[in-house]
């Protein structure tokens, strides 16, 4: 579960970086 949460955070960051 913790790993899943971490993956979600990394995914969101990558998407945000791409948008910027």
Curated annotation (Swiss-Prot):
Transmembrane segments: none annotated. Component of the core of the flagella. GO terms for cellular component: periplasmic flagellum. It comes from Spirochaeta aurantia. This is Flagellar filament 33 kDa core protein. Belongs to the bacterial flagellin family. The flagellum consists of an outer layer composed of repeating units of FlaA around a core that contains one or all of five antigenically related polypeptides. The keyword Cytoplasm does not apply. It comes from the Bacteria. It is found in: Periplasmic flagellum; Periplasm. The lineage of its organism: Bacteria, Pseudomonadati, Spirochaetota, Spirochaetia, Spirochaetales.
């Amino acid at each position: 579960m913790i790993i899943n949460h971490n993956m979600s955070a990394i995914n969101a960051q990558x998407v945000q970086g791409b948008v910027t």
